[in-house]
Every structure is written in structure tokens, then in C-alpha cells.
Curated annotation (Swiss-Prot):
Positions of the record's site feature: Required for function: E176, D214, E237, K239
EC class of the enzyme, as a word: hydrolase
Family matches, as HAMAP family: HSV_AN
Keyword annotations of the record: Endonuclease, Exonuclease, Host cytoplasm, Host nucleus, Host-virus interaction, Hydrolase, Nuclease
EC number: 3.1.-.-
MF (Gene Ontology): DNA binding; endonuclease activity; exonuclease activity
Native species: Elephantid herpesvirus 1 (isolate Asian elephant/Berlin/Kiba/1998) (EIHV-1)
SUPFAM superfamilies the UniProt entry points to: Restriction endonuclease-like (SSF52980)
Gene3D superfamilies: 3.90.320.10
Oligomeric form and interacting partners: Interacts with major DNA-binding protein; this interaction increases the nuclease processivity of the alkaline exonuclease.
Protein name (record): Alkaline nuclease
Family: Belongs to the herpesviridae alkaline nuclease family.
Amino acid sequence: MDFLSILPPQRHCTSELCDNDESVQAIISALEYTGLAKILTETFSADEFVEALDARLLYIAHIILSCKETNVPINTDTFLCPLAERIKVDVDDLNAGSLKCMKVLLHHCTNRYFIKIVEKMTRGQSSNLLWFLVRNELVTGSSVVKQCSYKPGLNSVAHGIFRPASRFEVFGKVHEPIVRDVIATFVERRPIPVSETLGLLIDPFSGTFGASIDLCYGIEEHDDGFVTVGERAHVYEIKCMARYIYSAADVEGFLDNPTLKGFASLIKGATFPLIEHRLPGATPSSGAHIVSHDRMFETNRKRKSIYESNDYVRRLLNINRGVKSTVYIFREKPQPDERDKLTLECLAKFTANIFLNARHKYFDQTSMQYFVVTQHYINDHPDPECIEPDTLPRVSVVTALFKTRNIGTHHSLEVNHKTYPNSAIPFALIVTPVAFDAEILSVFLRETFDNYAQQVYNKSKIRLWDPNFLRGFVASHRELEKTP
């Protein structure tokens, strides 16, 4: 079965609200007419210095007020009621002209509370219209490229929402929930902390950087619906490899006797192997997201031997070269006492020298996730100055490989008590921990912030600033001094 051909076409935003084109188009038109620069220009004087977090909250307030005024069916009161309480006005009196009233909130550390509200309101990510709107003009993993460089979004908000999703994106959206449940069942062996996909996480100190997380353990959802990041949180970035869907016949022999050597042979059999082999000290290409020095993954294909890389990339490659990934191998089997359902069993688990390629765009994405989640951990910690480096968040990339179903098998797949009809079958997960360098990441983030602030100034003549947003991040990576 060709799963890519039978998946129904989708728009990039799968929210049912997008079917109400008149309402959605109204809010999109309002945002594209104004934008962050125009909001700042109308609120502040030329050359005035504005903290980046304050600027972000003004823009988010504008977005949510625009949703209210254009009757987009979003519960805007979740954000507007606490906002009205803070600036001492009636929530029904809040409108686009109220933004200047928000100047009384400038420089308030309690403004970080609104960042938590945004996360709660944007759960579901691409199935949530507000996630697209609030994400606009944020620095995210998709707007950074090639380490220490930044490019603003070139496409309009409307393009991001209404563009057709590629068949690979659709495959990922359909199968990512399955992988989350596989991780919960076989890797973490505990329930998923937040039932819905986490919403947009915005850096609570700068308000400039954002990240969307596929799955995170070590967070806690409280009675008010807000989440806090605890010690040793573990972020899983899921990659469903739609380009590598194996037929059931191709993997049957391997699943009968799963070994690391057999897995390597399966990987090498692809026209463009998923895992790129490189000798120690050699620089990988930017095409494959995972690399190995193990000769088990070596192919006879000729590869370019020299690739350009800067000192930062070489340092990142060096600290990741020794990383060991864990490979899980699965096979479907009939669900006991339920003949019309399939479940998964773990056939084997082994470790291998497979690490994330610092030249690949996924490294930029995971770096942003690591930074933003760490900032939330610092913000949520009762005593940030006492944070130990070994309590900081971790990030792993989960590469999921799928196979077609056996001929004649049409039963639903059940994983973690959830049912998935007509899906491909996950038969391998490669869980790859990622190592980061706080010094390199801090340099990149500072350069990115300055670049972003300059672009905002060019459009608005307002100077965004935040000289200290990296202070806690840098300090948290230093070992605490031992007291006698």
C-alpha cells in the first residue's frame, strides 16, 4: 500500500476554523496590514527603547483583540480578562485602541504570566489557527539557518495557513501521534504529561524566540491549565521518515532476527541511506540528519570528502561524535482477545554510534527548542541561581521508520490505548540524544536577537532591547561553587 498516495490532501493549518474563510481572512488581513512594526510605531515615539518582551505582548494583544473584533471563534477572554485586570479596565472596553494603555505594564516581570496563557491557548499547534497567528514574526527553528544566521519569514500569514501541505507533511501529521504513544509505551514507560500537543512556547525573558514541542517529559500541567518545566525535562523531536517507507516483505527477514548489523544493512540498502557514514574527524554533508562513524553503516558509494564548516560547527560535531543512540525494533501482532486490532511488541533494543548532524537544519531546530525550554525551566524554578547543570532539559531526536501492512491486514493499530486505523506500522525508532554548547548557542542567540532588532528598527524606528535575556541561560550551565 502506498501510504503517501492515499493520504487525503490537507492545508497546512488543519483547524476547522479555517473553513470559515470570511472570518479567517478578516483577521489575516488585519494582521498583514499592521504587523509588529506598525503596532510599535503607533504606540511609541521614534527611537524609543522598548523591552522585547513588552513589544511581543503588545503584538500578541493586538492579534487577540483583532480575533475578537473580527468574530473569530476563539476564546479571547482567556488572554483579555487577566490583561484587563492588570491595566484596570473593563474587558468589554478593550479594543485595538487600548494598546497604549498597556504601557503601564512595561518592564513588569509578571508579564511572563501572559506567555503561559499563550501556550495554553495554542495547544494543538498546526490544528490551531491561533498558533499560526501568534507565531508570526517570532524567531523559530524554521527561521534560522546554517548556525548563527537568521532569515525572517518570506511568506505571508495567509500562505502559512492556507498553503497545501506536502504529502510528506501530511504523513508526518497522521503518524506523529503514533510515535508519541510508542515513546510513552516503550521508551518512557509512563503516561504523556499533557494530553494535547503543547502550544507555542515563547522565551519568557526576550519574547523573541519561540519553539513548538512534539513531546516533553518533565513538565507538569496544573489545575489552571498552565504548565511548568521541572528538573531534567526531556524534549522529543519526532521525525516520521515518509521518504523511507519499507514494504512488509523487505523487512520481514530482518524482523525475524533483528540485529544491529541487520539494521545497518537495511539502512544501507536505500538509494540515499538515512544514516550517513563518515570517518572520525571528517565533516558530513548537510543532507543527512544523522551520522555514524561505525563502519557498519559504510557504503561503497563515493561521497565528497571535504565540506566547508566554520569553527562553531566543528565544535558541535566534536561534542556529538561520541553520542550513542538507542534503536528500538517493533513488530505488530494481534491484540489479545481483540481479533480486529493489532498492537506492537518490542523485538530488540540496541545502542549504536549514531549522532545528530550539526550541519543539518534539524540541529538548528533542536537548539532553539533546548534554549526556549531551558528559559522556561529557569523562569519556573523557585531559586534560579541554584540551578545545577545536570538538572537542565535534554533533547532527543526520534527518527521513526515505518513499513506497510502485511497483505490482507486491515485491522486498526492500538498503541497506548489509542486506536489508529489505516496507518503505516512503525518498525524502528532511533532515539538520538543531542549535545549542545551553551557558549556557541549564546553567541548565536545574541547575534540573532541583534539582527532581528535591527530589522524591527528599520521598519518602525523603535529600538528593541534586552541586554540580560541570556544571563540566566549562561549562568545555569556553570557548575556552582562548592562551599567549604
